[in-house]
A protein has these predicted regions:
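Short amphipathic alpha-helical interaction segments
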Residues: 99, 103-110, 114, 136-137, ...
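Alpha-helical bundle segments that constitute or directly flank the non-heme di-iron/ferroxidase center
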Residues: 6-34, 54-65, 151-154
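A non-catalytic, amphipathic alpha-helix used as a structural packing/dimerization or gating element
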Residues: 13-20, 106-117
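Amphipathic, heptad-repeat alpha-helices with coiled-coil/zipper character that mediate oligomerization
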Residues: 76-77, 116-118
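Amphipathic, soluble alpha-helical interaction motifs
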Residues: 20, 24-27, 31, 62, ...
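Short, helix-capping/interhelical loops that line the mouth of catalytic, cofactor-
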Residues: 1-12, 62-110, 167-170
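Helix-driven interaction modules
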Residues: 105, 124-128
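Short, contiguous alpha-helical
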Residues: 37-86, 128-170
Length: 170
């Protein structure tokens, strides 16, 4: 799919990539979801399927947090309080830790809920708010949402497919 350029394309990209991701997730045996075999978000590290979902939930929740704080006129620490943009590997580790007690089913429910909340957020905004004004630095809100939802959903789907192929799973 092309990079979204407006509200309608953003919703379609999220829905499309999320659907493809959930199809891949639905065929994974639960007993394999905690094994750290996928290439991690930091060089020379590995993560589990559960870690990958935690990463997606973590970034989705950050998008919602950023929007909430901005909506209240509060300062937002991008990407997250205590982390700089050059420390995204550490932030990924934080997400894994934040959700380490959640099982595969719970993580999937959290991802469903987070994605639903983001789609509701998008629906509540006019296209001008999403794509016609800078929201963070030079980035629009729509671009920030896309970078933390539809693009990572596609990346996660591709990682899972590669992992399934290596492990001879369908």
């Amino acid at each position: 799919m092309a990079i979204p350029k407006d509200k309608e394309e953003l919703v379609k990209a999220i829905e499309y990539n999320y659907k493809k991701l959930t199809i891949e997730l639905s065929t994974i045996p639960t007993d394999l979801t905690t094994i750290k075999e996928l290439e991690g978000h930091t060089k020379n590290t590995f993560m589990s399927i559960n870690d990958l979902i935690a990463y997606l939930v973590g970034w989705g929740q950050l998008v919602l947090k950023w929007n909430d704080k901005k909506g209240k006129g509060l300062d937002v620490d991008f990407p997250e309080t205590g982390y700089k943009w050059n420390e995204l590997g550490l932030l990924a580790q934080k997400f894994y830790k934040d959700y380490e007690k959640d099982d595969f089913k719970t993580l999937n429910k959290k991802l469903d809920n987070t994605t639903f909340q983001i789609l509701k957020l998008i629906e509540s905004k006019a296209n001008i708010e999403l794509y016609e004004m800078a929201w963070y630095d030079k980035w629009t809100l729509g671009k920030m949402i896309q970078l933390n939802t539809s693009s990572p959903f596609k990346n996660a789907k591709d990682r899972i497919r590669k992992w399934k192929k290596i492990n001879q799973l369908k």
